A protein has these predicted regions:
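Active-site-lining helix/loop region of Rossmann-like oxidoreductase modules
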Residues: 1-117
């Protein structure tokens, strides 16, 4: 990694990283949930999208309203609306302020850098 030399020479105090996970990483049921939500949103606004004169804020309002009203069955895997969203906390809660995904990233980075932190 490009940062290794900086870390080795004690020139880095802290590293912050961000990862983005795809719904497909959870398998077919997660993809089905995403596509179901996306379809429901599209069906709610398709007539407005076809009109060049429609107000984008009206479209956005309908999208948000649709997301807020997804049923429990439509949010079974992620427990929150996935379509049109970024979910900041994925995987299991380790009960130490870290998700399992964050912990794995930290462990892997330290392994690559040869750090015992």
């Amino acid at each position: 990694m490009a940062i290794h030399g900086l870390v080795k020479n004690n020139l880095v105090e802290c590293v912050s990283s961000t990862t983005y996970q795809a719904a497909s990483g959870g398998g077919a049921k997660h993809m089905r949930e995403l596509l179901t939500q996306t379809g429901k949103i599209y069906n709610r606004v398709d007539s407005l999208l076809a009109q060049d004169s429609s107000n984008i804020l009206d479209i956005d309002s309908k999208v948000l309203d649709t997301q807020k009203n997804f049923s429990g069955n439509e949010m079974h895997c992620f427990k929150v609306p996935l379509a049109g969203s970024l979910i900041p906390w994925i995987d299991q809660d380790r009960n130490d302020g870290w998700s399992l995904e964050e912990w794995k990233g930290d462990v892997e980075l330290n392994k690559i850098l040869g750090s015992d932190k």
